[in-house]
């Protein structure tokens, strides 16, 4: 069996509290298994297993980080762990982001900034100019601002309640930005991404968007994360898709499926 498909039990090296509800768990990593921004891993707490984005990729320190938002029983248990505790990590899986051109735009909402933070690190290390539109419901939920600033990223913020930056939604703030970009990478709530993609398509900016779906196997076998009507598997052909691909996906921005396969509107 491919060792990538067997969980490797790793010790939590460090824990960073990003916000009241988000923690980043940092592990030592053998980079013979390459990790790309936008890929995900399956995190196993010895009771259950869930897909999580990789938010930190540091080959110099041989470390990766996984940022986890506290939203339910599984994440409650993980948030209760301490440095030195163990988690199982399986992967990485899926298609990540591709960098192209010299000027790139990142648009992230909430925990959607996790894979974009890793992408920003790589882009700035390559000497690219990076603009980031960071959105959240309130100022306390804006993520990775210090890290992005330290990397030399040009940051714009927006919050639903106006507590930091522009008051409104990410797509509304995007309409006020006139910068030309060679590409865009987007991750966050799907209704937000749907609106952002429409604006980027109108501006002829090539866009890559990272989707989230309910997953079980992570290796393209179970079909749980297939998208209507294309059959794209989010765990295999995704989670990162080009906007041209998502324009063929009937459910994008409209509905998703629950663990039983029933449609759930956004």
From Swiss-Prot:
Q: Keywords of this protein's UniProt record, alphabetized?
A: 2Fe-2S, Electron transport, FAD, Flavoprotein, Iron, Iron-sulfur, Metal-binding, Pyrimidine biosynthesis, Transport
Instruction: Establish whether keyword Transport is in the entry.
Output: yes
Its GO biological process annotations read:
'de novo' UMP biosynthetic process
Query: What does this protein do, in the record's words?
Result: Responsible for channeling the electrons from the oxidation of dihydroorotate from the FMN redox center in the PyrD type B subunit to the ultimate electron acceptor NAD(+).
The protein's annotated pathway: Pyrimidine metabolism; UMP biosynthesis via de novo pathway; orotate from (S)-dihydroorotate (NAD(+) route): step 1/1
Question: Does the keyword Ribonucleoprotein feature in the UniProt annotation?
Answer: no
This entry's comment on the bound cofactor is:
Binds 1 [2Fe-2S] cluster per subunit. Binds 1 FAD per subunit.
InterPro entries xref list: Cyt_c3_hydrogenase_gsu, Dihydroorotate_DH_ele_sf, Dihydroorotate_DH_Fe-S-bd, Dihydroorotate_DHASE_ETsu, FAD-bd_FR_type, FNR_nucleotide-bd, OxRdtase_FAD/NAD-bd, PyrK_electron_transfer
Q: Which Gene3D superfamilies match?
A: Dihydroorotate dehydrogenase, electron transfer subunit (2.10.240.10), Nucleotide-binding domain of ferredoxin-NADP reductase (FNR) module (3.40.50.80), Translation factors (2.40.30.10)
Q: Which CDD domains match?
A: DHOD_e_trans_like2
Annotated residues that bind [2Fe-2S] cluster are located at 217, 222, 225, 235
- Cofactors named for this entry: [2Fe-2S] cluster; FAD
What intrachain disulfides are recorded?
none
Q: In its UniProt entry, what is this protein called?
A: Probable dihydroorotate dehydrogenase B (NAD(+)), electron transfer subunit
Describe the family membership recorded for this protein in Swiss-Prot or TrEMBL. Answer: Belongs to the PyrK family.
Subunit info here reads: Heterotetramer of 2 PyrK and 2 PyrD type B subunits.
């Amino acid at each position: 069996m491919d060792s990538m498909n067997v969980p490797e039990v790793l010790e939590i090296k460090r824990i960073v509290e990003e916000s009241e509800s988000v923690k980043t768990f940092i592990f030592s990593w053998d980079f013979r298994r390459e990790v790309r921004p936008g890929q995900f891993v399956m995190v196993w707490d010895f009771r259950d297993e869930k897909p999580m984005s990789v938010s930190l990729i540091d080959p110099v320190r041989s470390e990766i980080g996984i940022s986890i938002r506290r939203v339910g029983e599984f994440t409650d248990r993980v948030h209760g762990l301490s440095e030195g505790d163990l988690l199982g990590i399986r992967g990485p899986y899926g298609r990540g982001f591709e960098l192209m051109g010299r000027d790139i735009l990142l648009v992230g909402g909430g925990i959607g900034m996790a894979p974009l933070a890793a992408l920003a690190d790589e882009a700035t290390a390559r000497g690219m100019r990076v603009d980031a539109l960071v959105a959240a419901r309130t100022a306390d939920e804006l993520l990775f601002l210090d890290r992005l600033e330290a990397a030399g990223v040009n940051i714009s913020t927006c919050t639903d309640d106006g507590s930091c930056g522009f008051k409104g939604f990410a797509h509304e703030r995007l309409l006020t930005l006139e910068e030309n970009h060679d590409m865009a990478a987007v991750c966050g709530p799907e209704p937000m991404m749907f609106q952002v993609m429409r604006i980027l398509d109108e501006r002829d900016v090539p866009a890559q968007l990272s989707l989230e779906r309910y997953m079980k196997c992570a290796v393209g076998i179970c079909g749980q994360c297939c998208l209507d009507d294309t059959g794209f598997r989010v765990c295999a052909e995704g989670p990162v898709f080009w906007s041209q691909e998502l324009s063929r996906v009937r459910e994008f921005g409209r509905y998703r499926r629950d663990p039983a396969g029933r449609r759930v509107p956004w």
